[in-house]
């Protein structure tokens, strides 16, 4: 088989964060979660350790994105909690006003990303695909567990996946980060 050179890429960082007080964060979500204005009055000192993790890992992501070792002036623009799968996160969407987004999972959950290169798949027929990979898939679903964090380009279409089989309460805290001046 020929070696395919991957020329363009969409990076998503996935990792597990330890040493955060998840019980305290869950309680905060239950007290502050409001639809539809989830980010209003959500920020709190309780979130400081998590915000530090968002910024540290976001810095690593942006350095790789920009191809630099220099620190980038990154700041959290919005932060909010999610519980269950409401309409605002259960349909494909992106975060247009930010550079990168991050989600920290307080319970298990699924996050699905849509391939931004759909047009390139127009003649790649599903019946011809033997094994799905990053070259031929329409979507990529990440199975998250408590403590997992994902960071991604905010323009990437994504949604919180609910398949109807899970009866647990899905909880996460998300943020949008921008490049400061």
Task: Give names to the regions the model predicted.
Residues 101-103, 167-181:
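A short hydrophobic beta-strand segment most commonly corresponding to one strand
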Residues 3-5, 150, 159-160:
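Karyopherin-beta/Importin-beta family HEAT-repeat alpha-solenoid scaffold
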Residues 1-72, 80, 89:
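Non-heme Fe(II)/2-oxoglutarate
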Residues 90-93, 158-165:
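Short beta-strand His + acidic residue motifs that chelate non-heme Fe in jelly-roll/DSBH
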Residues 107-109, 159, 178-181:
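Short coil/turn motifs at secondary-structure junctions
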Residues 82-151, 169:
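Catalytic core of non-heme Fe(II) oxygenases with the double-stranded beta-helix
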């Amino acid at each position: 088989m020929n070696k395919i050179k991957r020329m363009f890429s969409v990076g998503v960082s996935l990792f597990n964060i330890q040493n955060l007080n998840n019980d305290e964060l869950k309680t905060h979500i239950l007290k502050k979660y409001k639809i539809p204005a989830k980010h209003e009055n959500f920020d709190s000192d309780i979130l400081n350790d998590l915000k530090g993790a968002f910024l540290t890992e976001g810095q690593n992501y942006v350095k790789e994105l920009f191809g630099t070792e220099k620190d980038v002036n990154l700041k959290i623009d919005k932060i909010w909690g999610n519980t269950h799968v409401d309409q605002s996160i259960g349909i494909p969407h992106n975060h247009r006003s930010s550079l990168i987004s991050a989600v920290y999972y307080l319970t298990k959950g699924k996050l699905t990303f849509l391939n931004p290169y759909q047009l390139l798949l127009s003649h790649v027929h599903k019946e011809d695909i033997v094994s799905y990979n990053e070259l031929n898939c329409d979507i990529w679903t990440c199975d998250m567990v408590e403590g997992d964090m994902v960071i991604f380009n905010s323009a990437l279409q994504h949604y919180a996946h609910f398949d109807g089989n899970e009866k647990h309460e899905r909880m996460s805290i998300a943020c949008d980060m921008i490049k400061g001046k």
